[in-house]
Amino acid sequence: MVIAGLLFSLGAPRVGKLYDSMQYREAVRELVSAAKNARRDAFATGQPMDLLIDTSGNRYALTNQSQKVDVEEFEPLPAALDISVVYAVEVSPRPGLAAIRFYPAGGSSGGEIKVIRPSGAGVKLTIDWLLGAVMQELI
């Protein structure tokens, strides 16, 4: 009983860190997939697709009608992550809502998405303006 209690007390903090790490990795995967899906959908439908990121609410959405996007269309990201976006303000539907637009020809408006953990480590996703490619780099 004592040994089990000791093992639990030593393992509990690690489980919390493991869970945080898992959430971070899943959030990065979701954003990369969303950007790639937006690029693919723009090409397939012949209509521009926007990857919208609400940095204050830590959520994102894919849409081809960014002016009419509804709050319920957004997917949540972990609140513990600090998300910042460099984007072309011309394609943003409203202040405080970042948008990276993917065009049917394969290009995009370009931009960078930084996802930072509470520890300060993170990743930068760069969306190329010419080809719409998504690149990932540790920061």
Model feature map: region roles:
Residues M1-V2:
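N-terminal signal-anchor/signal peptide hydrophobic helix marking the start
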Residues L6, L10-K36, R40, A44, ...:
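N-terminal helix-rich module
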